[in-house]
């Protein structure tokens, strides 16, 4: 059964369609959008081996002409060089302004495909078909696209909304367990910043750290509620003028830790998990919420099999320095998203370097 969530924007509204087995109906879903017949499917080799044939057959059955472009897996390939290679394939296949790029993969594939679509011929349509939990509930929704710069994550990018986000939860069965757990960090984030009922549902679940632990109904509920939270926020603040910044809860310190560990020792969701622990601890110190609520959050993060400590090999001063290149810096001040209670957060630039330093030392692994 489909769950359909509208993302209502002043222009370029679209739908998130969620259903088991929906990948085989990709072509039929796209046929309703009045798109040109030429499409470029962008994926990575592993995902394409699993799901490329299903997607391509569905598109061809619906009358689309399909070209493909595969990019290596990993955050280290999220660069302008990789974007140029997508452009090369677009040239070779005569992609026009009426053509569409399709992202079949995780957040890296989605970010890069969206950025290529945003900039090819000054902007063509694209469709998100996320295959990781993290991409399904976060990266694929909201139109943020881009690549990394050697000095920081996602510093080069554009807002470019997809025409459709198609989510098939069953593709998660081939997702590596570590990647599934990384996605759960973003689910927990929505519970803390927006949806206290989702948080309670996660607390009530017996286990959260593996795909096989969740029955189909619970998985569909988690994905749907998370997507609804993201859609609600994006609909109210498309270009991150204010409210949308709350979606970066846990990301401020998390991004710094990711980049300092080469995007591999600590991957995105793990960085967010550590960042949420840090933000929750800062919020206790600033008396924004209680230690009891911070403990509930941290217990849920542990239940999802996620790290809660800064790795011992990461230099705290280097994290503080990395915060200065964060996208949320305004007038030289780092803006933090801090919880006030489960389901509600606030944005502040009043967190001093001394407090950050103290909290990071407190939550750094001593091993």
UniProtKB/Swiss-Prot annotation:
CDD domains: DHQS. GO terms for cellular component: cytoplasm. GO terms for molecular function: 3-dehydroquinate synthase activity; metal ion binding; nucleotide binding. Binds 1 divalent metal cation per subunit. Can use either Co(2+) or Zn(2+). It catalyses: 7-phospho-2-dehydro-3-deoxy-D-arabino-heptonate = 3-dehydroquinate + phosphate. Zn(2+) binds at residues 186, 251, 268. Its cofactor is Co(2+); Zn(2+); NAD(+). Keywords: Amino-acid biosynthesis, Aromatic amino acid biosynthesis, Cobalt, Cytoplasm, Lyase, Metal-binding, NAD, Nucleotide-binding, Zinc. It holds the Pfam family DHQ_synthase. GO terms for biological process: amino acid biosynthetic process; aromatic amino acid family biosynthetic process; chorismate biosynthetic process. This is 3-dehydroquinate synthase. It comes from Gloeothece citriformis (strain PCC 7424).
């Amino acid at each position: 059964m489909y769950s359909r969530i509208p993302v209502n924007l002043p222009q370029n509204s679209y739908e998130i369609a969620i259903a088991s087995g929906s990948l085989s109906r990709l072509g039929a879903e796209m046929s309703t959008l009045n798109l040109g017949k030429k499409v470029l499917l962008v994926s990575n080799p592993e995902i394409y081996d699993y799901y490329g044939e299903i997607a391509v057959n569905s598109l061809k059955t619906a009358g689309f002409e399909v070209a493909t472009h595969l990019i290596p897996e990993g955050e280290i390939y999220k660069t302008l060089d990789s974007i140029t290679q997508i452009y090369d394939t677009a040239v070779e296949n005569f992609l026009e302004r009426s053509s569409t790029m399709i992202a079949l993969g995780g957040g890296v594939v989605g970010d890069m495909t969206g950025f290529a679509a945003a900039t090819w011929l000054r902007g063509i349509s694209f469709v998100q078909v996320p295959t990781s939990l993290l991409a399904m509930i976060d990266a694929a929704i909201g139109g943020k696209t881009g690549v990394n710069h050697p000095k920081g994550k996602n510093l080069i990018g554009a807002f470019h909304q997809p025409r459709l986000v198609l989510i098939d939860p069953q593709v998660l069965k081939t997702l590596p367990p570590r990647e599934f757990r990384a996605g759960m960090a973003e689910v927990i984030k929505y519970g803390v910043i927006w949806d206290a009922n989702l948080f309670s549902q996660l607390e009530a679940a017996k286990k959260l750290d593996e795909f096989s632990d969740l029955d189909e109904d619970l998985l569909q509920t988690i994905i749907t509620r998370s997507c609804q939270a993201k859609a609600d926020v994006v609909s109210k603040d498309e270009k991150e003028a204010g409210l949308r910044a709350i979606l970066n809860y846990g990301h401020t310190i998390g991004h710094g830790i990711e980049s300092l560990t080469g995007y591999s020792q600590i991957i995105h969701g793990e960085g967010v998990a550590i960042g949420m622990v840090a933000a929750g601890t800062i919020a206790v110190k600033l008396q924004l919420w209680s230690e009891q609520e911070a403990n509930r959050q941290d217990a849920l993060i542990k239940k999802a099999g996620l790290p809660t400590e800064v790795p011992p090999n990461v230099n705290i001063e280097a994290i503080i320095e990395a915060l200065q290149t964060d996208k949320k810096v305004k007038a030289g001040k780092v803006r933090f998203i801090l919880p006030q209670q489960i389901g509600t957060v606030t944005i502040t630039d009043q967190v001093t370097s001394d407090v950050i330093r103290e909290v990071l030392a407190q939550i750094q692994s001593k091993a």
